[in-house]
Amino acid sequence: MTQAEHRPTNFIRQIIDEDLASGKHSSVATRFPPEPNGYLHIGHAKSICLNFGIARDYQGTCNLRFDDTNPVKEDVEYVESIQRDVQWLGFEWNGAVRYSSDYFDQLHAYAIELINKGLAYVEELTAEQIREYRGTLTQAGKNSPFRDRSVEENLALFEKMKDGGFKEGEACLRAKIDMASSFMVMRDPVIYRIKFAEHHQTGNKWCIYPMYDFTHCISDALEGITHSICTLEFQDNRRLYDWVLDNISIPCHPRQYEFSRLNLEYAIMSKRKLNQLVTEGVVEGWDDPRMPTVSGLRRRGYTPEAVREFCNRIGVTKQDNTVEMSALESCIREDLNERAPRAMAVLDPLRVVLENYPEDLVEELNIPNHPNIPEAGERLVPFSREIYIDRADFREEANKQYKRLVMGKEVRLRHAYIIKAERVEKDAEGNITTLYCSCDRDTLGTNPADGRKVKGVIHWVSAPHALDAEVRLYDRLFSVANPGAAEDFLSTINPQSLRIVPHAKLEPSLRDAKPEFAYQFEREGYFCADSKLSSAEKPVFNLTVALRDTWVG
């Protein structure tokens, strides 16, 4: 995966190929239009890779446009985080960042054009009445009593809306289409509503705000977008997208294409539910390493290359499906296996004394940073009379399948000597506090001269040089594959999604670990220093992914 990423093929790219071949378009222009009301998640990453990837591969452009038509739910914090995420994923947008609010004046003018054409009217039914009049999937809606107002009256009332003459909910502007349409979205949809809220871009200039379906298509047209790509839930909305553009004086008419959204096992993609996890303190924030957000994945140690590869592998189709979490984990595992430098860390330390090793001797062992990349260089790792091994790597008694250290038996220390367990020291409760071993000083980097075979290999850290650290072992946030289907999704939280190891012992080279840069802790997994919690005084490392998939559900 460190090699050049392959160029994917999918039905949208086939459409683009046909459009270019036929001369329908001479170039390609796409856009990524998030609403700044939350942090981006892995589902958005799929859309980013699709839209920006198309622009890159066809030498076209991709705009970053914030769909900022609801000032109540939006925040500059989200605007900034989204820009960081897009850039982290390896993409750059065309020109300046754009906002739907950049077009509020034009959108207002197009709304007036629809009124003048008798295609929009000011509605004074309540929201509940509008829902009642809309009908159902099997029953046609009925016309509003305000539907046949004159153009002059509608213009005056819309101006009154704009000037703050109505309270929120007292009036809205609706498109006049067909209350008997078999598509609910075409039953006179609301295209403007009143909101007395300060906007993060326009301040208090407006108290009326356009709806998404009205804004989106016009913004696409104003920007000259050729292929407007969105997820399948907007498939019916394409009819409204086309209706708006067909009925206003705008030369460009983009086309909308839909693909299936990403559904990932053991995760949720609803921004509302993700926000609930944050506001109710279930997680530590939008960038909690258990969250499926781009910032959460980054903090956990995921690489942009792994995320892009995942998006390439799952592909772009029109069929809804759910992707196994192991598919995402496989991508980061493969990527880090190739690139991550190795280090040794003992998560559950057991003190070991090598009784025949000189007390005042410290050896600096040259250990390769990566077994398959010589150019990654070497590091010096201290070795001394007292070391730590993992408690799970020693047993007083064990069967033949146990290949680690057993009382009276030998094991090799990774990159170092063969040692033999001689005796233990225990506390009053019978817990082993110290393991005493002998060390074969003739086996550093070589096999025993007498030809005896020692199969087991374990990792270690020099005790006087060890870096004390907190290690956070992350697992899947939910205990069921489809938490979104549960009546109460919070009841499916995995209580073991975070386990904190407070006193891990790490080799000293990790003292300078950069946040979010992953290492392979040999025999343990891939870990990175936490970007928020880790410090020189108290290092904190996050588990990115285990060496192999051990999830049993």
Swiss-Prot record:
Belongs to the class-I aminoacyl-tRNA synthetase family. This is Glutamine--tRNA ligase. Its EC number is 6.1.1.18. A motif ('KMSKS' region) lies at residues 268-272. A motif ('HIGH' region) lies at residues 34-44. L-glutamine binds at residues 67, 212. Transmembrane segments: none annotated. It catalyses: tRNA(Gln) + L-glutamine + ATP = L-glutaminyl-tRNA(Gln) + AMP + diphosphate. It comes from the Bacteria. It is found in: Cytoplasm. InterPro entries: aa-tRNA-synth_I_CS, Gln-tRNA-synth, Gln/Glu-tRNA_Ligase, Gln_tRNA_ligase_bac, Glu/Gln-tRNA-synth, Glu/Gln-tRNA-synth_Ib_cat-dom, Glu/Gln-tRNA-synth_Ib_codon-bd, Glu_tRNA_lig_a-bdl. Monomer. Keywords: Aminoacyl-tRNA synthetase, ATP-binding, Cytoplasm, Ligase, Nucleotide-binding, Protein biosynthesis. GO terms for molecular function: ATP binding; glutamine-tRNA ligase activity. ATP binds at residues 35-37, 41-47, 231, 261-262, 269-271. Its main location: cytoplasm. CDD domains: GlnRS_core. HAMAP family: Gln_tRNA_synth (MF_00126). Gene3D superfamilies: Glutamyl-trna Synthetase, Domain 2, Glutamyl-tRNA Synthetase, Domain 3, HUPs, Ribosomal Protein L25, Chain P. One of its GO terms (cellular component) is cytosol. One of its GO terms (biological process) is glutamyl-tRNA aminoacylation.
